[in-house]
């Protein structure tokens, strides 16, 4: 079984983990309702790009 030859330092470990942070979701303002929603998703009222996808 492979065993590390040297202990990984805190600096080396943290440098490796710099890209693991969370990113905020891409929100855009809906032109019809004015609400914020995620891009490329159906709005809460069931429309997408001005067309009704889901009728309530």
UniProtKB/Swiss-Prot annotation:
Residues 1-56 are annotated as: Disordered. Residues 7-20 have a biased composition (Basic residues). The keyword Repressor does not apply. One of its GO terms (molecular function) is structural constituent of ribosome. Keywords: Ribonucleoprotein, Ribosomal protein. One of its GO terms (biological process) is translation. Coiled coil: none annotated. It comes from the Bacteria. One of its GO terms (cellular component) is large ribosomal subunit. Residues 29-38 have a biased composition (Basic and acidic residues). HAMAP family: Ribosomal_bL32. Belongs to the bacterial ribosomal protein bL32 family. PANTHER family: 50S RIBOSOMAL PROTEIN L32, LARGE RIBOSOMAL SUBUNIT PROTEIN BL32. This is Large ribosomal subunit protein bL32A. It comes from Listeria welshimeri serovar 6b (strain ATCC 35897 / DSM 20650 / CCUG 15529 / CIP 8149 / NCTC 11857 / SLCC 5334 / V8).
